[in-house]
């Protein structure tokens, strides 16, 4: 994964939402209980929050991801989701564009700088940006779905989500191109396209079929 991968998904997201109208903004996303307005608001707010992480880290400082923590984050999504489509689009465009400008400032020796997002560093923050933009672009339900996810992204996401595998299960995900395994215990093997298996593991609808009995997964880490 490189900055170019994040730039590509950011460009795709903004192109996908360029024609956003009121009906589209109020339509259902893939996420239960969330309209597209909710997803767009979350993406814009996340982009602003991550911009703060980057800018402060480059100055040698740490800052909270969201002022007020998770409750304030959730309240901001709900209050912002119902804005006019033009406002949603403007907020998203400005926030994502500003975030990408901040990422462009990061030099080769800056990536280990610490941030408070997941108590990690700028390199992990860039990966988080890749995940958030890629997954939620699919969540918008605007013609892009996990079938478009690259193999590199799928393998990264599977590894990030390893804590979702239940205890006492040896999970085997078998695709035509790769075998991914996690956990110890009773073998549970699922087969399908890598994108479908990854979508399921991420808690999203798989575009194609998966064979095998899917276990109940643990929460996101």
Segments and roles (model prediction):
Residues 2, 55-65, 105-221:
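Structured surface interface patches that mediate subunit assembly and partner/cofactor docking
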Residues 7, 11, 44, 48, ...:
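A structural signal for well-ordered alpha-helical segments within the folded catalytic domains
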Residues 19-25, 104-111:
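Surface-exposed helix-capping loop/turn segments at secondary-structure junctions
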Residues 1-5, 24-46, 75-88, 114-132, ...:
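Alpha-helical scaffold segments that form or flank carboxylate-/histidine-based iron centers
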């Amino acid at each position: 994964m490189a900055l170019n991968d994040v730039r590509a998904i950011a460009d795709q997201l903004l192109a996908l939402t360029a024609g956003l109208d009121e009906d589209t903004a109020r339509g259902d996303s893939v996420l239960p209980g969330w309209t597209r307005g909710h997803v767009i608001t979350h993406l814009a707010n996340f982009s602003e929050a991550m911009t703060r992480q980057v800018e402060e880290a480059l100055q040698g400082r740490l800052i909270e991801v969201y002022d007020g923590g998770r409750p304030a984050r959730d309240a901001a999504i709900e209050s912002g989701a119902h804005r006019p489509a033009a406002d949603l689009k403007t907020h998203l465009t400005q926030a994502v564009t500003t975030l990408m400008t901040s990422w462009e400032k990061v030099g080769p020796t800056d990536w280990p700088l610490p941030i408070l997002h997941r108590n990690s560093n700028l390199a992990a923050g860039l990966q988080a940006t890749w995940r958030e933009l890629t997954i939620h672009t699919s969540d918008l339900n605007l013609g892009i779905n996990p079938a478009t996810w690259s193999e590199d992204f799928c393998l990264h996401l599977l590894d990030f989500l390893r804590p979702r595998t239940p205890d006492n299960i040896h999970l085997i995900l078998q695709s035509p191109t790769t075998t991914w395994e996690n956990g110890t215990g009773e073998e549970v093997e699922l087969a399908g396209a890598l994108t479908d298996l990854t979508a399921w593991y991420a808690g999203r609808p798989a575009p194609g079929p998966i064979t095998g009995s899917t276990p109940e997964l643990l929460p996101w880490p």
